[in-house]
Amino acid sequence: RPEMERFKRHTRANYYTPGSPVQFVCVELLKGELSGENAVCLTFKNISKVTLTALEIHFKCKGVDGIILCEDAFEYREIEVKPGESFGMDDAVFVTQKAITSVDVVLKNVYSGKKVVHLDAIKRVRLPAPRRLSPELEKALESRMNRTGLKYMPQVFENGWYCACGSFHPKEEDTVYCTECGCDRILLQN
């Protein structure tokens, strides 16, 4: 992917699928330095206790004025994703010359060996937007946690929690540690 690194836009998912062993984390839009094409890469995380071997999704990419540029299915096959690991970020699901303004992802089926979990009947839950900290609070929290990039108010909801780095952890993940920045939820809350 070295040719695709010039331009990168990273957008976190603003919804999640309750009960799913896999979480849709973010969309990355990469622009080719030579081709000028936009590649859509999706990142998912295994939040279960088992190794995942395949994932089937449906996605829709929209351009300017909400025009659908692509609507398709994509399969991540022959993968071996251990609990807590992320995947998909190296696979372009769609490449276009046009500007992409939004990407919608629906989880269909996830596999662990021969076992399958059907997710298409589960209604997705929209996440509240993470709340930005004031610059003073941001500095104080980063200093206390000895980390940078903590720009958001840590929040706990009935369906999960937001870390100060902006990462959402659904209750299905069952962790007090942020898998993205390593912060401890309990320390963040105090």
PLM regions and their residue ranges:
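Short, solvent-exposed loop/turn segments enriched in Ser/Thr/Gly
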Residues: 34-41, 88, 138, 144
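Asparagine-centered strand-capping/turn motif at beta-strand->loop junctions
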Residues: 43-49
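Hydrophobic beta-strand segments
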Residues: 57-59
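Intrinsically disordered, low-complexity Pro/Gly/Ser/Thr-rich segments with frequent PxxP/GP/PP motifs
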Residues: 65-99
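Short, solvent-exposed loop/linker segments at the N-terminal edge
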Residues: 32-35, 154-155
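Terminal connector regions
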Residues: 7-16, 88-141
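Cys/His-clustered metal-coordination modules, chiefly Zn-binding fingers
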Residues: 117-190
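Short acidic/proline- and small/hydrophobic-mixed sequence motifs that coincide with surface turns
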Residues: 51-54, 69
